[in-house]
Amino acid sequence: MHRRTLLASAASLAVVTHVRSAAAETPGVTATEIKIGQTEAYSGPASAYGAIGFGLVAFFKRVNDQGGIAGRKINFISVDDGYSPPKAVEQTRRLVEQEGVAFMLNGLGTPSNTAVQKYLNQKKVPQLFVSSGADKWANPKEFPWTIGLQPSYRTEGQIYAKYILANKPDGKIAILYQNDDFGKDYLAGLRDVLGDKYDRMVVKAVSYEVTDPTIDSQAVTLQGSGADVLVTAATPKFAAQMIRKIYDLGWKPLHLLTDVSISVASVITPAGPERAVGLIAAAYGKDVSDPAFKDDPGMKEWRAFMKEYMPDADTTDANYVYAYSVGCVTLQMLKQCGDDFSRANILKQATNLQNLQLPTLLPGIVINTSPTNYHPIRQEQLQRWNGTRWELFGDVIEGAGS
């Protein structure tokens, strides 16, 4: 009797030990749930991007309604960081240490993601598909647990420089940039292509802080430089202000705008559609306002999703299209995990995406990653605002980055 009790206790201990060991290997994952964390700017100067978080909440609700992943429901915990790095650190630590998420997904912005990058890599928590085009997310040697998604700002700067050289070879360039890695990556990209012409062609570069109320004074300074080309590397609030201000000043440079601020709802409409005519931006996702995609199967899929899961949302807002793209990539990555949702395998699958086509990406643009290639999207196409919508022109261009 005593021997049986001892054996039973040993067996129970073995089961408990195995369960604890499995739980330790797959934090945030149980037999019924996969817990994912996100910090998002639902308030503050970049609150227009809050639509991305809302879009992902809806996307994962659909995933759950359709049965989840490998028999598990997604528990997506998205919290506000106000676009404040200290708040992002606080919220990220809470999600990792208290909520015990399996991985962090699509955190917003260069400053906030920079603030948590070392912490997440030290903890070996995947920091996946960062919502920022900073080049620093593609550094697998130093930060293997961090990977971006969209084309890097530096690559986009290179694309814009190529366009300027081809169309305004004698142009005088003025630049407005956010005073952080986001803005400085554009300067680096322009310099990559312009080379020794940079100092001659760039007649003025002026920065702004995310805490500035307006950029009106910067616009006046840039106009006074005599430039006939303007590159604006700014988030939506400041991009809209710039479009409006240069129109009011009567300044008409060739204006190139970062692709993070191409939303009709959060940039063009506040600025005034008529004020943005001729504006050029790069794109990798399909534009919801472009009639060319009215009958596109991918956009039909997106519209059906929006109608069912976000019926009251503004469907002219490109942030919802971006959110759907992020959701689709994450879904594919989770499917590739099979039944192994350890953090190591989650990272492995995120860095082994092959020729992935998404319903919301422009034709010809695909996603590829590898353990040495942390630039998932490296292609873009230019588009011009015609007063009512964005019009694509030219060929798909692949930038630098491997």
Please give the residue ranges for each predicted region.
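Extracellular/periplasmic Venus flytrap/periplasmic-binding protein
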Residues: 86-90, 135-138, 143-250, 292-297
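N-terminal secretory signal peptides and thylakoid transit peptides that target proteins
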Residues: 1-17
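Extracellular/periplasmic periplasmic-binding protein-like sensory domains
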Residues: 246-322, 396-400
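Immediate post-signal peptide segment of exported/extracytoplasmic ligand-binding proteins
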Residues: 23-36, 70-73, 165-170
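Extracytoplasmic "Venus flytrap"
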Residues: 28-29, 37-57, 79-86, 108-109, ...
